[in-house]
Amino acid sequence: MNIYAVGGAIRDELLGVPVQDRDYVVVGATPEQMVAQGFRPVGKDFPVFLHPDTQEEYALARTERKTAAGYHGFQFYFAPDVTLDEDLARRDLTINAMAREVSPEGALVGPVIDPFDGQADLRARVFRHVGDAFVEDPVRILRIARFAARFADFTVADDTLALMRRMVDAGEADALVAERVWQEIARGLMEAKPSRMFAVLRECGALARVLPEVDALWGVPQRADYHPEVDTGVHVMMVVDYAAKQGYSLPVRFAALTHDLGKATTPADVLPRHVGHEGRSVELIKPLCERLRVPNDCRDLALVVAREHGNLHRVMEMGAAALVRFFERSDALRKPARFAEMLQACESDARGRLGLDTQPYPQAERLRVALVAARSVDAGAIARGVGDDVMQIKDAVHRARVEAVKQALAIGE
């Protein structure tokens, strides 16, 4: 039995970046031998075991063969006679098809085992597929795009990009299950440069299949006096990258991605203006989230940001009553944490424009101060003093909040 560290751990070690995942392959062992040594079996489709002490995953060396369309259409072969090179050959990219032996004490020993020249591709900053079997797994399209968001200075090899296009043309991207699409998109959004993920997906044609609502944004013009970058797709990528640069949460980054979807459906005769795009964005986000089974926190923030971002940009023009109505409409009084994320998404929108990434955004501070004031009102005490009439209570609480905001912002009305 020989144990090897494989894949991302070796890649990241060579790149000098923190190792995010550690995967191990065991050559020359049977499932029974693994169990006898205290490993706990957890794999459904093929033998994967958890180490008794570290709980890290160890998989028996295996080969795989495509038997049907889609992500699950594989037949696996695992046995003590499967070699390390055979196991590495089934992997997606050369930079992920390297290994080092692990000593009984758990240390990496010996040279890097690199049968597909992954080290050369690391030096060249190139994503290159290992072999023709790459086309058998459509998830690899999404994985390469996600890696591009993490390693933003890498490019996709021409022959690899051609294979990805062939896969898309053959309908392989259509066979991807919703959960896996969302998983990879979400992980890519949380990388350092999410726009690179979408660039790769566009380049191979996959974005139009998995996120057609986003793909449709490129080529849609905006007013140059508001958007020097003009193209809506370019703007949205700048917004997402700004949110990533600030380290914002996944819900904020997803809201940044989807806030302007409605601009793709603006009638051609009114371009480059986009009156009413907020409502159209909401109507596109709803089915998108249902289709990809997007988590509720991401969906809910995306919807409120899409609907209200235009209003939020204009809050410097609002009086106290309008601000309180805005808080009530966006549920800021009950959900201040979500409202804080809404501010982050809208600030990203304002700064995700060509040459405007450092411009002041006083709207955020105005809203923070106003919200603290509005939430300081004791609605319970007011209700006890008014009586049982629900409408009277609501009106009295609203008026008290307006007065509190007036005082906090020194607004004379």
UniProtKB/Swiss-Prot annotation:
Magnesium is required for nucleotidyltransferase activity. Nickel for phosphatase activity. Residues 232-333 form the HD domain. Comprises two domains: an N-terminal domain containing the nucleotidyltransferase activity and a C-terminal HD domain associated with both phosphodiesterase and phosphatase activities. Its cofactor is Mg(2+); Ni(2+). Keywords: ATP-binding, Hydrolase, Magnesium, Metal-binding, Multifunctional enzyme, Nickel, Nucleotide-binding, Nucleotidyltransferase, RNA repair, RNA-binding, Transferase, tRNA processing. It catalyses: a tRNA precursor + 2 CTP + ATP = a tRNA with a 3' CCA end + 3 diphosphate; a tRNA with a 3' CCA end + 2 CTP + ATP = a tRNA with a 3' CCACCA end + 3 diphosphate. Mg(2+) binds at residues 21, 23. Catalyzes the addition and repair of the essential 3'-terminal CCA sequence in tRNAs without using a nucleic acid template. Adds these three nucleotides in the order of C, C, and A to the tRNA nucleotide-73, using CTP and ATP as substrates and producing inorganic pyrophosphate. tRNA 3'-terminal CCA addition is required both for tRNA processing and repair. Also involved in tRNA surveillance by mediating tandem CCA addition to generate a CCACCA at the 3' terminus of unstable tRNAs. While stable tRNAs receive only 3'-terminal CCA, unstable tRNAs are marked with CCACCA and rapidly degraded. Gene3D superfamilies: Beta Polymerase, domain 2 (3.30.460.10), cca-adding enzyme, domain 2 (1.10.3090.10). Its EC number is 2.7.7.72, 3.1.3.-, 3.1.4.-. Monomer. Can also form homodimers and oligomers. A single active site specifically recognizes both ATP and CTP and is responsible for their addition. GO terms for biological process: RNA repair; tRNA 3'-terminal CCA addition. The keyword Metal-binding applies. ATP binds at residues 8, 11, 91, 143, 146. Disulfide bonds: none annotated. InterPro entries: CCA_bact, HD_domain, NT_sf, PolA_pol_head_dom, PolyA_RNA-bd, tRNA_CCA-adding_enzyme. CTP binds at residues 8, 11, 91, 143, 146. This is Multifunctional CCA protein. The keyword Lipoprotein does not apply. GO terms for molecular function: ATP binding; CCA tRNA nucleotidyltransferase activity; cyclic-nucleotide phosphodiesterase activity; magnesium ion binding; phosphatase activity; tRNA binding.
